């Protein structure tokens, strides 16, 4: 058995889970998420917990077993607590502005970037150098944060760019000139 897959998922009182064929529907106070499940994986709701089992013991099915258990766990956590990622913009003249559903980023280039935030994810700004990405779908939150970070990744000499709050940038020593 998969070490992750065999663990049951406790369902909080505020969450409702339905299994209809190959679809798992999770509804909570923050919203609703739907996940399609492979035929080789069985999902049951029993005694206030979700149990994920597999039909076969081949290598691929074993991998899917742990994957779908983690996906369902993240869905339950998302509709109760939600997920968030924080980004920091570092550099002289680097800043971000929000207008409606779009972010406008000045990142040292001659033009500013416009990033349209997709549905299901909200973005909050703290000043003009901090970005907080929030939502109920862990994948979407991580994807949006990664797309914003990819606009200007932090460089190792001065640390200019967009980085996650918990990310540590390995700094390099610059060239030292020849002294006579």
Swiss-Prot record:
SUPFAM superfamilies to which the protein is assigned, alphabetical: Ribosomal protein L6
Any single biological process term in GO: cytoplasmic translation
Record key words, sorted: Ribonucleoprotein, Ribosomal protein, RNA-binding, rRNA-binding
Keyword Cell inner membrane: no
Entry GO MF terms: rRNA binding; structural constituent of ribosome
PANTHER family: 60S/50S RIBOSOMAL PROTEIN L6/L9, LARGE RIBOSOMAL SUBUNIT PROTEIN UL6M
Family under the similarity heading: Belongs to the universal ribosomal protein uL6 family.
Record's subunit section: Part of the 50S ribosomal subunit.
Task of the protein: This protein binds to the 23S rRNA, and is important in its secondary structure. It is located near the subunit interface in the base of the L7/L12 stalk, and near the tRNA binding site of the peptidyltransferase center.
Name of the featured protein: Large ribosomal subunit protein uL6
Lineage: Bacteria, Pseudomonadati, Spirochaetota, Spirochaetia, Spirochaetales
Originating gene: rplF
